[in-house]
Amino acid sequence: MPDQKDRILHFKSPLGDKRCAISALSGYERLNALYSFDITLLTELDPIAPQELLGEDVTVTITVADVERKLHGVVCEFDEVDPVGDNVFEYRAVVVPRLWLLGLNSHNRLFEGKDAVEIVKQVVKDSCGLAIETSNLKSYRRREICCQFGETDLEFVLRLLAEEGIAFYFKHTKSDCKLVLSGGMSGFENCDPVTYPYNERDSSAWKHRVSRFKRAGRLCSGKLVSTDYSEYAPASPLKVEAKSKASKKLRPGELAFHGGHDFELKGDRNLPNGDCKEQAKRWQHGLEADGAQYTGDSGAPSFTAGHKYELEDIPVSSGGEKQFLLTEVTHSATEGYDQESYYGNSFRCVACSDSMTFTPAPPRERPRVWGPQTAKVVEVKNPEISGAHAEVKVQFPWDEEHNSCWSRVAQLYAGNEWGGFFVPDIDQEVLVEYINGDPDRPVVVGAVYNEKNKIPPYTKWQSGIRTRSGDYNELRFDDNPGSEEVYFEAGKDHNFLVKNDEAGEIVRDQTLKVGADQKVDVGSNIEYESGQKINVKAGTEIVMEAGMSITLKVG
């Protein structure tokens, strides 16, 4: 193969410098997205097996007029192409960031007491080891619980960043690639060099210049309405709005979001309206990110998505703006083995503004869990101590390391200090549903028996309720034909209160057995009437006492 030393495209890999060389490159990089580059490799005599490069870290160097641009990544695809000549083999390799590997992992798990940035760092570290830098980030709310369910690690990370309005891009240094999380315009780095001339008439492809620069625009939604609800402030459902400052003609339409907020625990758990308003603003900025842009062409390989540059000889189409943030760059290069070498790119950018935050578009869909799941109760909140709702923590079989957040328990009905109240106990198996399918908002809707927790010793005709304590209380119904029965048992005491009258009818016999004393305290009269006889028997004595008189009448 030709020596790579004096070429505009250089390929560094575990194969060494002389095994193969690049003949062409094309690819793109975007702000808030993963980059991807297709490279064409040529080798002589010694074919390359896919396993030699798949999963390997490689570096592509683009050199134009003594300015180098590094592209680091991992090979995710490798295809053999038809030979281009005698003993010359051609291959196609796709190079992506190591963050791409997160798309190969999928987990069902819970994160407790962490903010979005902490979660992202942990997932990236565990999955691919890509270095992360943060720039101009603020503090983010700690989430009581954050659930990853049915998502790849990559989908999960991108969702968290979008929910918090955190922009990201990749920074390629001489030795490696880093993921940069940015919280505002000052969090984006400059291109190197930072200043580029504008000249449409110069046909040289090797100058670091902008050869085309035009305005571009898109219609986008001009208003975002976000609603939500928290059981800790049921009388004040959340509704926040964010509007564009542009004209309604350019920003028609309105997008409605519901249930997209993760409320932070703050004392009484009131809704953090200020935080939600800021989140709505960030989401609106994300919707407007593509509204007013510029497109162009250049011969500068140092143009990198997520980086800023300054334009000299400002064209009329710039509207007087001088500094711009690159949001998308598409690269193209060919190596001059049998043709003239070439490098060029096309790009999209926005004018830099301190008031602008180029955030990701809000996630249109959170992951959904449709249908119930089983879980085991691991903690029960005592309402006598906390004054809280009927709440439990559960552990899911797909995450034995963490417990869920405090989850409400659905009742038959619930009012203000009235309604049903049954709370499952520790080690019970329960069924969990999710409000609007959101895995971060579980609700316990029932309990089921299993091999460990067996049903009460009832027959097929019997049903009822048996509670758990040192002993138990029970209300049982027996529907065996001819032997129907309602059975009540108190584990210790039985107390009841009738605030007016009590009436009843016993068609046949009544038997009452009292193991110790019986006392009846009546505020007025007692009347007994028997159709035949009344027997009174005492083991030792009978004492009858009247304040005035005793009357005994016979016949």
Regions found by a protein language model. Name each.
Residues E80-V95, L179, S332-C349, E384-E391, ...:
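Short, solvent-exposed secondary-structure boundary/capping segments
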Residues D66-V74, S317-T327, G336, G437-A447:
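Short, Lys/Arg- and Gly-enriched loop/turn segments at beta-strand edges
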Residues V84, K114-I132, K138, C146-S353:
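Extended, domain-scale alpha-helical bundle/helix-rich regions
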Residues S26-D38, P272-D290, W398-Q411:
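Short, basic/aromatic beta-hairpin or loop at an interaction surface
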Residues E52-L53, S302-F303, P424-D425:
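Short, well-ordered loop/turn sites that connect or cap secondary structure elements
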Residues M1-C20, H208-V210, P360-P363, W370, ...:
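Polar/acidic, low-complexity leader/linker segments enriched in S/T/G and N/D
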Residues M1-R109, E163, G291, D297:
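Assembly/oligomerization scaffold segments
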Residues F170, L181, Y309, E340, ...:
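Structural signature for extended repeat/solenoid scaffolds and their inter-repeat hinge/linker regions
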